[in-house]
Amino acid sequence: MGAEWLPVRKLGMVRGISPDSNLIRIDGISVRRGHRTVLHDVTASFPTAKVTAIVGPSGVGKTTMLGLLNGLIAPASGTVSFSEIGLLTEPTALRAARHQTATIFQDHALIGRLSAIDNVLLGLADTRHPLSPLPWPVAARQRAAKALDDVGLLDLATRRTAQLSGGERQRVGVARALIRRPKLLLGDEPFASVDPALAQQLGGLFRSLAMREGLTVILVLHQLQLARAIADRIIGLSDGRVAFDGPAAAFDADLEARIFPSLALSHDHSPPLSQPKETICSID
């Protein structure tokens, strides 16, 4: 049976959703690349106003799952349902959904000669336009200023990004995503290039934004300690299968060592688990 993109209600209204609701749910998803199956029968849900971390070793399908959620990768089988945002095969609907999704990458690709606020405004630009300051309307500049204020950088709005620290540039990247007023915020290893203290600070920013703005935040992380510290929920992938799905507080060092022996900070010498045929641990 092929993949099914489920019809949804009209786009929008996320800020009226209960914090306990799930914005996104995937059921029985499999993704293949050539003859290799990258994700095997994955089922997971992603709640509104919460931060979900997707963790696991390299090559287990974390980034593939992110590509699935932003509509860039089509599954071979399974269903994808969005409470308020739908990814459909019809191009117009897909574009509408992408307008409500923002992705933050490790390489935030700012333009050093532009100010922080001009870099943020580029989040609104049509990619066909030149990457240079445009005569933005007042309303757009107000939105950019608010986005910078949300990440604590309003005082540096006119400073060129080449003059900012690494952490400040990362915040500009977050603000550029926020100016689009997304309902879904995705991050692919967004803290890989910053030190642990700054990563925790930025992680706290994501949690605050999720709660205050009603965002569904999904982060791919390889730092397991950081995932426990900043996420509300953790999904652990092993060989393309869900090995853990539950509250971050339940993902303790012992469980981490059992599921991810190669990544675990614990030096437990118990034998590693075999490839999971099903979810090892799911805690609601």
From Swiss-Prot:
Residues the entry annotates as binding ATP: G56, P57, S58, G59, V60, G61, K62, T63
Gene Ontology MF annotations: ABC-type phosphonate transporter activity; ATP binding; ATP hydrolysis activity
Membrane topology: Peripheral membrane protein
Pfam families in the cross-refs: ABC_tran
Main location: membrane
Catalytic activity, EC: 7.3.2.2
Location in the cell: Cell inner membrane
Subunit record text: The complex is composed of two ATP-binding proteins (PhnC), two transmembrane proteins (PhnE) and a solute-binding protein (PhnD).
Alphabetized PANTHER family for the sequence: AMINO ACID IMPORT ATP-BINDING PROTEIN, PHOSPHONATES IMPORT ATP-BINDING PROTEIN PHNC
Protein name in UniProt: Phosphonates import ATP-binding protein PhnC 2
Source organism of this protein record: Rhodopseudomonas palustris (strain ATCC BAA-98 / CGA009)
Gene of this entry: phnC2
